[in-house]
Amino acid sequence: MQLNEAVSKRLTELLDERNMTQYQLYMKSGVPKSTIGNLVNCTYDSMKLRVLHELCQGLEISLPEFFASPLFEEENLEP
């Protein structure tokens, strides 16, 4: 899978685990709703690390916790 697909799946997992909507994440993180929607729907080419950091703050996790998923293991990602 491509990296943007892994980010989308992980973000969706974390939202589901917390019973949190994209709107609630927007309210907690300050990341625009459209950006969150683009990430969830894989309709972006790149993202800034700052955005991911803000999302993690809204989810109350660290960046390492975000990436602590089999989704990001080398064998699961396309080069």
What are these regions (language model features)?
Residues M1-T21:
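A short, Lys/Arg-rich alpha-helix, primarily the initiator
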Residues T43-E54:
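Short, basic-rich loop-to-helix N-cap that marks the start of a DNA-contacting helix
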Residues N38, F67-P79:
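Short, charged recognition helix plus adjacent turn
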Residues L15, Y26, C56:
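The alpha-helix within a helix-turn-helix
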Residues N19-N38:
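Short alpha-helical DNA-recognition segment
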Residues D16, G30, N41, L71:
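Residue-level detection of the helix-turn-helix DNA-binding "recognition helix"
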